């Protein structure tokens, strides 16, 4: 005659931090509880508590003949409960549970084949400090907020992708609100072992009624846009074909041509500064003053190498007013003699 021997389940209780330091190996009939989080792990007779996977309500029911499981990781919900991944790591599906996760939710083990998706309600705040479907407050730490890293040789997608599919969308894809002591945005493209034709920043716009990039600065003694070219080699002539500011005007593919202007300089309110200034070794070589005059030095106006077809034309850089003034000064000198 066979005899049914009921399974006896032993419980051990410690705080999560104590379990992490513990070398206790739970037997197959033992369950360890984290008293401060409510998590539970079932022993296997071989591994430490921290090496075991958390048990789900289903596992717990089978082990304990379905007792009240309200004391587990989160309160039992009618339609949404703890789900169990294949690697035995718990995944929460109900944010309203507000479960304290001891500063970290560790999703590890196995191969992740799914996605972690958020579909917020319409009431999510848009504040740049307290809003967002995902909000990370780093006020109490000096670490990075989000780190996306890959060690793959190739990839089918970017490390981060931002997209909107609606033409009526009226907000930026990326917004940076910064008040600090370093650069608001840093892009560092490392030197490749084999140089390739790629850029640290590539901006392409198909909007013909807007600029591809707009810059607005309020500098006292610096340029709104500063471009520095550095020779990648110690050889003086290595970069002889490089340019700090190349400007290319191109026609559309299969188009007839282009009539775009190369460099357009304008001051809508008027400026008394030089409109164009070219230097080498910190010495002025050529500049155009606010009145349109061409100069090589402060007092040496260009004459020999600049040929004017119509020096008295009103629409020429050497304006009629300028020529008239120069002739007047010349007449004064002649009369003195």
From Swiss-Prot:
Reactions catalysed: Random hydrolysis of (1->4)-linkages between N-acetyl-beta-D-glucosamine and D-glucuronate residues in hyaluronate
Function, in words: The hyaluronidase of this bacteriophage mediates the penetration of the hyaluronic capsule of Streptococcus pyogenes.
A GO MF term: hyalurononglucosaminidase activity
EC number: 3.2.1.35
Protein name per Swiss-Prot or TrEMBL: Hyaluronoglucosaminidase
Annotated organism of origin: Streptococcus pyogenes phage H10403
Matching Pfam families: Hyaluronidase_1, Mtd_N
GO biological process assignments: capsule polysaccharide biosynthetic process; symbiont entry into host cell via disruption of host cell envelope; symbiont entry into host cell via disruption of host cell glycocalyx
Entry GO terms, CC: virion component
Keyword Metal-binding among record annotations: no
């Amino acid at each position: 005659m066979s005899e049914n021997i009921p399974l006896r389940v032993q419980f051990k209780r410690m705080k999560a931090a104590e379990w992490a330091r513990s070398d206790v190996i739970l037997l197959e009939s033992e369950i360890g509880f984290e008293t401060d989080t409510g998590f539970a792990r079932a022993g296997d007779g071989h591994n430490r508590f921290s090496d075991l996977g958390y048990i789900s309500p289903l596992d717990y029911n089978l082990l304990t003949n379905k007792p009240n499981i309200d004391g587990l990781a989160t309160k039992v919900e009618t339609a949404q409960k703890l789900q169990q991944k294949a690697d035995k790591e718990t995944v929460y599906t109900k944010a309203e549970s507000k479960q304290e996760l001891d500063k970290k939710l560790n999703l590890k083990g196995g191969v992740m084949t799914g996605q972690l998706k958020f579909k917020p309600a319409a009431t999510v705040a848009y504040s740049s400090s307290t809003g967002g479907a995902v909000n990370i407050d780093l006020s109490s730490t000096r670490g990075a907020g989000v780190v996306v890293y890959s060690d793959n040789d190739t990839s089918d997608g970017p490390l981060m992708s931002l997209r909107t599919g609606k033409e009526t969308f009226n907000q930026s894809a990326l917004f940076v609100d910064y008040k600090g002591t370093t650069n608001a945005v840093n892009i560092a493209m490392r030197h490749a072992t084999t140089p390739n034709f790629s850029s640290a920043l590539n901006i392409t716009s198909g909007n013909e009624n807007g600029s591809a990039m707009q810059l607005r600065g309020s500098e006292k003694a610096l340029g709104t846009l500063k471009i520095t070219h550095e020779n990648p080699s110690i050889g003086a002539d290595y970069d002889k074909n490089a340019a700090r500011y190349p400007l290319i005007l191109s026609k559309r593919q299969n188009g007839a041509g282009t009539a775009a202007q190369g460099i357009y300089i304008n001051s809508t309110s008027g400026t008394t500064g030089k409109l164009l200034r070219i230097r080498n070794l910190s010495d002025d070589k050529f500049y155009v003053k606010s009145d349109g005059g061409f100069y090589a030095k402060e007092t040496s106006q260009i004459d020999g190498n600049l040929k004017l077809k119509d020096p008295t034309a009103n629409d020429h850089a050497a304006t009629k007013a300028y020529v008239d003034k120069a002739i007047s000064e010349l007449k004064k000198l002649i009369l003195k003699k």
